[in-house]
Every structure is written in C-alpha cells, then in structure tokens.
Amino acid sequence: MANPILEQAKENMEKAEASLRRTLGQIRAGRANASLVNRVNVEYYGAMTPLNQIAAITIPEARVLLITPYDKGALEDIEKALYTADIGISPANDGSVIRLVIPQLTGERRKEIAKEVGKEAELAKVVVRNARRDAMDNLKKAEKASEISEDEMHDLEEQVQNLTNEATKKIDAISKDKEKEITEG
C-alpha cells in the first residue's frame, strides 16, 4: 500500500477508531476504570498537571478507584480537581488516599449509556465514510490528471473500500464490547 491517498485514508480511519476508544473509555459503565480520570488535571504548584502524573491510580475492587498521590500535600488539590472535573462521582478523602466508588447503574441508565455508545460509534463511522469519500475524490482527481491509469484507479478504489469495511467492522466490535460491558455491569 504505497499510494499516499490510501495511506492518508488508512491513517484517518485509524484515528477515528482511536478516538472512539478514548471516548468510550471515559464512559462510566458501572465498573472502575482508570480512564475515567484521564482528563482530570490538577493545579499542582501553580501548574495544571494530569492526575496520572502526580498520583498512582489503582483498582483494588471492581467498583473502586483508588488514587494515591505521590506527594501527600497534593491530596486536597486532587480532591478539588475531581469535584470540578464533573465525572459524576464524589471523591472520598481519608487523609492519605482518595477513593472513587462507582455507583451501580440502574437499568434505565444502562440503556441511556448504551444509546450514547451507539451515537459515538456512528460518529466514528461518519469519519470513516468521510475519509473514504475524500480518498475516492482524490483518486478520481489523480486519474483525471493522468497520474494513475483507470485500472489502477479501480484497484485503489477497491482497496479504499476494503479499508472502509475493515474500519467499520472494528468500530462495530468496539461498540459491541462496550455495550456488553455496560449491560453486564
């Protein structure tokens, strides 16, 4: 796959998949997951610092996230950052660590989250389809400019379609896995 148009399409499709994984990782599914606090930044000595750089994040139980700061003086700053991050979970500070207890999800909330997962997956598919469309347009332009032959264009179009199908299958699998995680709780 030496064609730059194919490379660009593949890269864009992989970015859509990676973005979906990141987004779904931040959706609370009734289980403790360190990615819930990935986007939390703590004001630490005057600078905004990612939480995972100033504290160890562990999962001692299925529904408990344990945050142990490397510097005990940062405990209150971390707690404040968790409150302001609006992750939907109240931190419990016991003086040396912070516990985030993930509440059990109700059936109704599970359905809402599953719908949200579906919407995010559909957005990722739109990005994939846009990458496909852009690649097809670029192939047609290249053919009109006599940079590639008609046969090459058809072969490349087929490869772009295969990339699209592959990316869509991956997105569906990621989405199904997350929905399964949510419904099983």
From Swiss-Prot:
GO terms for cellular component: cytoplasm. Residues 167-185 have a biased composition (Basic and acidic residues). GO terms for molecular function: ribosomal large subunit binding. Keywords: Cytoplasm, Protein biosynthesis. Residues 163-185 are annotated as: Disordered. The keyword Methyltransferase does not apply. SUPFAM superfamilies: Ribosome recycling factor, RRF. It holds the Pfam family RRF. One of its GO terms (biological process) is translational termination. It is found in: Cytoplasm. Responsible for the release of ribosomes from messenger RNA at the termination of protein biosynthesis. May increase the efficiency of translation by recycling ribosomes from one round of translation to another. Belongs to the RRF family. This is Ribosome-recycling factor. It comes from Latilactobacillus sakei subsp. sakei (strain 23K) (Lactobacillus sakei subsp. sakei).
